[in-house]
Amino acid sequence: MDNELFEKAPIPEAYFSLAMPVVLSMLVTLVYNMVDTYFIAHTGNTDMMAGVPLTAPVFTVMIALGDIFGLGGSSVISRLFGQHRFADGKRLSAFCFYAAIATGLLILVLGLAFRDPMLALLGATDDTWQYASDFYTLIIVGSPFIIVSMTPSNLLRTEGHAVQSMIGSVAGTAVNIVLNPLFIHGFGWGAAGSAGATVIANICTDAYFVWFTLRHSSNLSIDPRTVIDRARRRLAVTAREVGSILAIGIPSAITNLTQSVGIVMINLFLLPYGTDAVAAMGIALKVIMIAVLVFVGFAFGAQPLIGYNYGARNMPRLRGILRFSYLFLSLFALVMTVVLSLSDRLLMGFFIEDATIITLGAGMLRVQLLSLVCVAVVMVTTCTFQSAGKAVGAFVLSISRQGVMLAITLFVGSRLAGYQGVIAAQAIADLLTAIVAVILFVVMLPELRSRKAR
């Protein structure tokens, strides 16, 4: 473990060493998602194009479940490492790994048992049923591998292995990009081929993470004996430790889930204004998502650094890290706002050629960009609460931006300003959530000022 990086390296160096690999990994994954859609679209089969996206919420749930043990575990383990309790960190890392496997197996059993009701709930019709079913079935079969992949990718960063975490994620994405056209077009497996490529890619990612942990990790473990008290024949993990992991992991999972919920809510409120408005907002939100993913990468890439120094009670360094995080991401968001605003029509044109939708979407994009700085503030604050184990603050922010706050602003905005109110709802929700984040952070400040070194 690179204690020098966490304890003594200049803050910008430590910050970017941990965060940049996460940013790059997220951007590569974003590229894959676009490429995956491209390969499905080029089958020319509209029923397949409609059927496969119906299963997207299932994949989102799997990622969220993986985050419970990945982000929740990394928060607790980072703080333990800061206290130099390396044996406890190793024990909990093994618990998180096998808890993710158990969760994946549970999803596999339940997902197959309730396949038909789930497909109906997801909106599969007679035309799309077969394609949705093919994709859903293979994704469910691969759920243990998909869920598990999220755990070591986060835990490795607690030791400073951010680059190796990125390599595992990027390698899986590369395998997916290679296998997708081969399985879909070369072998003619269609939707099943796309799902199969995704599962195999996650298996490759898991294999790399297991190999790296066994060969190069000094304070993480996947040895089941690490987490079993053989003398008492029970798990060597306390209810309090599990509760600490879940207290941070569940809000992280909720954050992922509310992203999908938020998009659905916006679409429902836009439907009365026509499909062009829905399509335009969909593209505008894709552009915004690119910026948000970069923010997430920078903010949460630094999570092990924040957690380690909080656990070590190194308050001067922690305050310096937080100042740098807020300043850097806020300035970065400001630059992104200007650049994307000046390129609004060009960016819309990358996704569609319809002039009406480009005009609508460009206006929507400019409105959404007004709150990018607020999004940056929310991301850094959320990461701070998660890193410090502040479950209440993390939970409040996880349900706010694209959950409770968005629901309120959509409802009020649509009634007060109609179409324009719906368009501005997310930006206003971002502003309100940022205000809540600042208030919660101010409440936390006395502890940051008074917390003494051990």
Where do the model's predicted regions map?
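Small-residue-rich hydrophobic transmembrane alpha-helices
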Residues: 49-109, 146-165, 280-338, 342-344, ...
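Hydrophobic/aromatic residues in alpha-helical transmembrane segments
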Residues: 20, 36, 73-74, 114-115, ...
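Hydrophobic transmembrane alpha-helices of multi-pass small-molecule transporters
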Residues: 61-64, 176-180, 206-210, 290-293, ...
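Short alpha-helical transmembrane segments in multi-pass integral membrane proteins
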Residues: 1-19, 77-144, 186-249, 306-371, ...
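Helix-terminus/linker motif at the lipid-water interface of multi-pass membrane proteins
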Residues: 27, 31-50, 119-126, 182-189, ...
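N-terminal transmembrane alpha-helices
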Residues: 7-38, 42-43, 57-72, 76, ...
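Short runs within selected transmembrane alpha-helices of multi-pass transporters and secretion channels
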Residues: 139-157, 165-176, 194-209, 296-299, ...
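Transmembrane helical elements of multi-pass membrane transporters/channels
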Residues: 17-36, 138, 172, 201-205, ...
